Structures are given as structure tokens and as C-alpha cells.
Curated annotation (Swiss-Prot):
Mutant phenotype after disruption: Deficient mice exhibit significant differences in lactate concentration and pH in the retina and display reduced visual function.
Residues in compartment: Cytoplasmic: 1-14, 80-85, 137-146, 194-228, 279-293, 340-352, 408-492
Protein name: Monocarboxylate transporter 3
Comp. bias (Basic and acidic residues): 476-492
Organism, scientific name: Mus musculus
Tissue expression as described in the entry: Expressed exclusively in retinal pigment epithelium and choroid plexus epithelium.
Length: 492
């Protein structure tokens, strides 16, 4: 079709090769979230060989997680500059090299630099591009795709931890690290299938040699002026302060309540099993026509349910009540995991998603470095898990309430502004708005600053005919900034 044809030919295919991309995203998400926790099964041997304490060896996983979250902006810049596939291939090699080099480490600091920094950076360079490509391939089925991809985290965690235990018993921690390094080469295979989706050819940059406009697009910090994005960032910060604390302390909390060791460890398996079921189920539910426009409120409900679960279960002492807590916690935790990136994609749109995701992960890294360590120190000081559950539950519940209230206020404000302009401006207002958009250095989105309003119209194909040309420009931006380098190579 010509350039002025319908958007349907240029939009996300919602299937086809997208299912292969979804499978790769499932694997990458599993490695990114499951690997730092799976490495902890080697800590006992590391303590013995290096004569270190638990807190010293635990820094390996902490550094890995800090790199996964904290290098988000760097990953965004690299994806925009080189495309998703090259970044993921390089990330897979880095992650594998980090674990292989770690198997030859003779000091803990060498483990920090190899398994912590190199492997963490490699996982980050795989995780973020995979989510970006998922958003380019799915639109109508995007909630379901996000839910299925997010299920990789509990699935891989339930597989990698027993595998690490087995490898450690048979080959020692050095052999286990070496084999884990080989396992991480699967990230390269996942990166190889990340070809850009079919669509119109990328537009040429009007400025010579890339110029200032090109450099500006490497990381779109202007997204921080979008009040909808600010709402999401504050919500994620509050959420990350307390969301992971109960899962980290659950086993020790159960042992403190008199539960035997084997039964206490089984509680995490219950959380994992419910989480595996909840993520794709919630993704399918969020994709329903009547619910999809209200995904931010569904996300808020999941956060509120998770926080209330922590608050209600803070005084649970019997094994039966702890099992009930694990079921409720796993369900709400899975809902949060399935919806968090869907809300961000719907809020900022595909062109700004790489930059937005990088900035969100950076903010989340700060919260993760504050929340769980502070909870551990409070437990050591107070010898009381109940207060920790109250604090964690309050933070997550507050995040849910904040998200719901501010989303409602933003939508009302946007509707009032739009109705006021249509009543006063007449026919000249659209021209003024278009002129303002043309004067901006980089087109960021077709929505007004309060882009939460876009969540009420999530199906572009149902829009009015007058909006078709604007909608058609979005995939072109995607291909230019994310997959343009790969698309040019294929065309050549």
C-alpha cells in the first residue's frame, strides 16, 4: 500500500514472528530475574573457600541486581543507537563471559567484578531490548504477551535454583559457574531472533551526520515532563521499597514462628507456583475489551491487594495461615509482574518506551537498594518481623492508592482542558496545536502531556479517519530509533 494507506499494514503484527519474539522474551526475563537469586545457592561454598561472611558473599547477587536495574539508561542509549539485536548479542556474550571468568576467581573482589558487574550488565542489555521488541510486535494482544513473558521469572527461578544445587554438589561452585556461563549463551540465541517487525522504511534524519536532533533521541529525558510518566515513576519507587521484602524474609519468618525448615522452604514454592499461573492469567484478563482501558486501575488494585495481604498476614503464626498468605501474595505479586510494563507501554507509547523504561529501572534500582537492606537491618535491630511486614505492606498499598487517585485526577484534568479548548478555540485550535508540535525538536507522542488519557483509547484502528496520518508516523519512529539499523541491513 502507499504511504497514505491505512495503518493496519504498518502496525504491530500481533502474531506471526511475534510469537518467536515472545518465546525469546520469556527466556530472557527468566534469566534476568531468576539468575541473581539462583546464584545464591553457591554462597555456602563461597563462604568456606574465601573465609567470608554471608553479607560479603551476598554482594555478588546485590551487584548483579544493581547492574540489571541501574544500567537502564545506558541500555536505552545503546538500543536507540545500534538496535535491539546487536545489543542483545553483545549482552549475551558479556553475561556468559562474566560467569566463565568468575569460575577462575581467587578473591571475592574478582567475583564482584565478573559475576556481579559483567554478568549483571549483560543481563541488563538483554532484558530491556527484549521488552522493547515485544512492544513492537504486539498491540491488541500486548497484555497477554506481557503476562506470558513475565511468567519466565518464576518458571526459571524454580528451575535454576535446583539446577545450581545439583551442579554445586557434583562439580563445585567453580564448575557450576562455568556451566551457568554456557547456559547464558542462550541469550545470544534469543537476541538473534529479534528482527525488526515489518513496516514502512525508516525515515532519514534531516540533520547532517545525525546532528543534535539525533543525539537528543538517544535518551529522551523529555519524557520526564509527562505527568503520567511521573505518576508511574513515583508509584514504582514506592512499590519497590516494600514489594520484595516479604518474599526475602518469608522463610526466616516462618522458622521464627516454629515452622520446620523443610516446610518453611516449601512456602516459597507455593508463591512461585501461584505466580506462574497468575501472570499469564492476569495478562489475558487485562487484554479483554472492557478491562484494557482501565489497566492502570487494575494495576493499582493489584498493588493494593499485595499491600493489604502483607498487613493482614503480619501476625500469622500457624502454618495454615502462612500458606494462605503465600497464595494471596503469589496471586497479587503475579498480577503486579504481569501489568507493570503493560501500563508503562500504554502510558508513554512505543516511540518513548526505550527511554522511559531505562529511567524507570534506574529509579527502581535506588528503591531496591534502600528497601530490602533496610528491612534486614531493622530485623537485626528489633528482632521482630511483624513491624517489617507492616512497613512493607504500607508502602505497597500506598503505591496502589497513589496510582489510582493520581490517574483519576490526571484523566479528569485532561478531559476538562480538552473540552475547554474545543469550546473556545473553534477551528483554529488544531492548527495552533499542530504548529506547536512541529516546532519541537523531537516528536515524542501524539498525546497531550497528560498521556494517561491515551489509555482510554488503546485501539488505534478504531480511531477517526482524520487521525490516521498521525498514527502512521509512530511505527516509523519505532523502526528508526530501535530497529532501523537492522532493517537497513536486511534491505541491503
Amino acid at each position: 500500500m502507499g504511504a497514505g494507506g491505512p495503518r493496519r499494514g504498518a502496525g504491530p503484527p500481533d502474531g506471526g514472528w511475534g510469537w518467536v519474539v515472545l518465546g525469546a522474551c520469556f527466556v530472557v526475563t527468566g534469566f534476568a530475574y531468576g539468575f541473581p537469586k539462583a546464584v545464591s545457592v553457591f554462597f555456602r561454598e563461597l563462604k568456606r573457600d574465601f573465609g567470608a561472611g554471608y553479607s560479603d558473599t551476598a554482594w555478588v547477587s546485590s551487584i548483579m541486581l544493581a547492574m540489571l536495574y541501574g544500567t537502564g539508561p545506558l541500555s536505552s542509549i545503546l538500543v536507540t543507537r545500534f538496535g535491539c539485536r546487536p545489543v542483545m548479542l553483545a549482552g549475551g556474550l558479556l553475561a556468559s563471559a562474566g560467569m566463565i571468568l568468575a569460575s577462575f576467581a581467587s578473591r571475592l573482589v574478582e567475583l564482584y567484578l565478573t559475576a556481579g558487574v559483567l554478568t549483571g550488565l549483560g543481563l541488563a542489555l538483554n532484558f530491556q531490548p527484549s521488552l522493547i521488541m515485544l512492544g513492537l510486535y504486539f498491540e491488541r494482544r500486548r497484555p497477554l504477551a506481557n503476562g506470558l513473558a513475565a511468567a519466565g521469572s518464576p518458571v526459571f527461578l524454580s528451575m535454576l535454583s535446583p539446577l545450581g544445587q545439583l551442579l554445586g554438589e557434583r562439580f563445585g561452585w567453580r564448575g557450576g559457574f562455568l556451566l551457568f556461563g554456557g547456559l547464558l549463551l542462550h541469550c545470544c540465541a534469543c537476541g538473534a531472533v529479534m528482527r525488526p517487525p515489518p513496516g514502512p522504511p525508516p525515515r532519514r534524519d534531516p540533520s547532517p551526520h545525525g546532528g543534535p536532533a539525533r543525539r537528543r533521541r538517544l535518551l529522551d529525558v523529555a519524557v520526564c515532563t509527562d505527568r503520567a510518566f511521573v505518576v508511574y515513576v513515583v508509584t514504582k519507587f514506592l512499590m519497590a521499597l516494600g514489594l520484595f521484602v516479604p518474599a526475602i524474609l518469608l522463610v526466616n519468618y516462618a522458622k521464627d514462628a516454629g515452622v520446620p525448615d523443610a516446610e518453611a522452604a516449601f512456602l516459597l514454592s507455593i508463591v512461585g507456583f501461584v505466580d506462574i499461573v497468575a501472570r499469564p492469567a492476569c495478562g489475558a484478563l487485562a487484554g479483554l475489551g472492557r478491562l484494557r482501558p482501565h489497566v492502570p486501575y487494575l494495576f493499582s488494585l493489584a498493588l493494593l491487594a499485595n499491600g493489604l495481604t502483607d498487613l493482614i498476614s503480619a501476625r500469622a503464626r500457624s502454618y495454615g495461615t502462612l500458606v494462605a498468605f503465600c497464595i494471596a501474595f503469589g496471586l497479587s505479586y503475579g498480577m503486579v509482574g504481569a501489568l507493570q510494563f503493560e501500563v508503562l507501554m500504554a502510558t508513554v507509547g512505543a516511540p518513548r518506551f526505550p527511554s522511559a523504561l531505562g529511567l524507570v529501572l534506574l529509579v527502581e534500582a535506588v528503591a531496591v537498594l534502600i528497601g530490602p537492606p533496610s528491612a534486614g537491618r531493622l530485623v537485626d535491630a528489633l528482632k521482630n518481623y511483624e513491624i517489617i511486614f507492616y512497613l512493607a505492606g504500607s508502602e505497597v498499598a500506598l503505591a496502589g492508592v497513589f496510582m489510582a487517585v493520581t490517574t483519576y485526577c490526571c484523566l479528569r484534568c485532561s478531559k476538562n482542558i480538552s473540552s475547554g479548548r474545543s469550546a473556545e478555540g473553534g477551528a483554529s485550535d488544531p492548527e495552533d496545536v499542530e504548529a506547536e508540535r512541529d516546532s519541537e525538536p523531537m516528536p515524542a507522542s501524539t498525546e497531550e502531556p497528560g498521556s494517561l488519557e491515551a489509555l482510554e483509547v488503546l485501539s488505534p484502528r478504531a480511531g477517526s479517519p482524520e487521525q490516521e496520518p498521525e498514527e502512521e508516523a509512530v511505527p516509523e519512529l519505532d523502526h528508526e530509533s530501535i530497529g532501523g539499523h537492522e532493517a537497513r541491513g536486511q534491505k541491503a
